[in-house]
A protein has these predicted regions:
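Glyoxalase I/VOC metalloenzyme domain signal
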Residues: 1-54, 61, 66-150, 159-271
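Active-site and NAD+-binding cores of ADP-ribose-processing enzymes
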Residues: 155
Length: 271
């Protein structure tokens, strides 16, 4: 856990997660949306055509409802989290899902979610890769069930392959899901993912940082492998993005990518 990011590594034998891993390999088998009321959100989703998933809760665990999402994955509904509706530490009822279903490690307090870690603070987006011709269908899935709206559309035609993408965003603006498909019949990186994953699914998770340079330094020091970028990329930054205001030497040293325009920059790096 770090900032507003919570990952669960599920190694439970004979579980949905284990069966999912056998089919798709190491991947994302489920995500969870925070909602004000689980019962209302779940029943609404079912009434709009979602397929429910009947999970089995262990003794003392919360019974968390879920629906079937993209590529055999699940979408859970959670309405218990620390700080909900402005609750403060020590307030009655200020407990979360992790307080009920998990036990903290020795020496780790209940407020470990505030640990500084490597400067990662939130989940920026969850990119879905789908078969060609299915982008609109999955965009409609999130629009119909969760009132997401399309905020951007891309149709990028490369020399060999292309990509089409719809960027969907939740009403609160905190959940962003780009949905990608191949832009033409020539197989590219999206089809490569579909082949390796054995179907449609969540291709990557993007994590936000308040200081990407410091975060990259910390991640590399911790042994995390990040993708390289050729030096000539940085020779063209000033021409490609006039007035960007970033220190290109610092970006080059860390192999951080820069896109956008002055005042609307995106700094990113891939693992």
């Amino acid at each position: 856990r770090q900032g507003g990011i919570n990952f669960i590594v599920n190694a439970e034998p004979d579980s949905f997660a284990q069966r999912f891993a056998r089919l798709h390999g190491p991947s994302i088998c489920a995500i969870a949306f925070r909602v004000n009321d689980v019962k209302t959100a779940y029943e609404r989703a079912l009434s709009l055509g979602a397929w429910g998933y009947a999970g089995v809760a262990g003794p003392g665990e919360l019974n968390i409802p879920a629906i079937k999402g993209i590529g055999d994955s699940l979408i859970y509904f959670v309405d218990k989290w620390r700080g909900k509706n402005g609750a403060q530490p020590g307030d009655i009822g200020n407990i979360g899902f992790f307080d009920v279903d998990f036990e903290p490690l020795p020496g780790v307090g209940a407020d470990a979610l505030h640990a500084p870690g490597h400067g990662l603070t939130y989940i920026d987006h969850l990119t879905h890769n789908v078969h060609r011709g299915r982008m609109a269908e999955w965009a409609g899935f999130y629009e119909r069930l969760f009132n997401f709206r399309e905020v951007r559309y891309f149709d990028i035609e490369g020399q060999v392959t292309g990509v089409k993408s719809k960027a969907m965003t939740s009403p609160c603006g905190k959940i962003r899901i780009p949905i990608n498909e191949e832009g033409n019949e020539k197989a590219g990186q999206i089809q490569e993912y579909l082949d390796r994953y054995a179907g449609e699914g969540i291709q990557h998770i993007a994590l936000g940082s308040t200081d990407l340079l410091k975060t990259v330094d910390a991640l590399r020091a911790a042994g995390v492998t990040l993708l390289d970028t050729i030096d000539t990329y940085y020779e063209l930054v000033d021409k490609r993005i006039p007035g960007h205001g970033e220190n290109v030497t610092e970006l080059k040293q860390r192999k951080i990518l820069i896109d956008g325009k002055a005042g609307e920059l995106l700094l990113q790096i891939f693992s």
